[in-house]
Amino acid sequence: MICSPQNNTGAPMKKRNFSAEFKRESAQLVVDQNYTVADAAKAMDVGLSTMTRWVKQLRDERQGKTPKASPITPEQIEIRELRKKLQRIEMENEILKKATALLMSDSLNSSR
């Protein structure tokens, strides 16, 4: 039988969503303020494995590694947004190239 995680009262726990800012500030307790992972997790009321993951992600992002999860540092958030924008612009450029070629082809055929 598979059981879902439960809180102290025995009721099923709801998945909590945390903002990038909350994750970053929580991880900074360990990385910048020398808290232990356990102390930071307790102070921020999150699980130990969650805090460990956030600390690893913050360290990776500060080293310039692109995160697999949603980025938490402002720089990585901006990089992700810029990549999406670049991808959209490249797609629009391809569409314009094809449209131009089609229009040129039509104008050549109609002039004959």
From Swiss-Prot:
Keywords: DNA recombination, DNA-binding, Transposable element, Transposition
Family annotation (SUPFAM superfamilies): Homeodomain-like
Stretches assigned to coiled coil: none
Gene3D superfamilies xrefs: Homeodomain-like
Positions of disulphide bridges: none
InterPro entries with a match to the protein in the record: Homeodomain-like_sf (IPR009057), RD_transcriptional_regulator (IPR051839), Transposase_8 (IPR002514)
Molecular function via GO: DNA binding; transposase activity
Gene Ontology BP terms: DNA transposition
A UniProt-annotated Pfam family: HTH_Tnp_1
Similarity section: Belongs to the transposase 8 family.
Function statement: Involved in the transposition of the insertion sequence IS911.
PANTHER family linked: PROTEIN DISTAL ANTENNA, TRANSPOSASE INSN FOR INSERTION SEQUENCE ELEMENT IS911A-RELATED
Protein name as annotated: Transposase InsN for insertion sequence element IS911
Natural source organism: Shigella dysenteriae
Gene that specifies this protein: insN
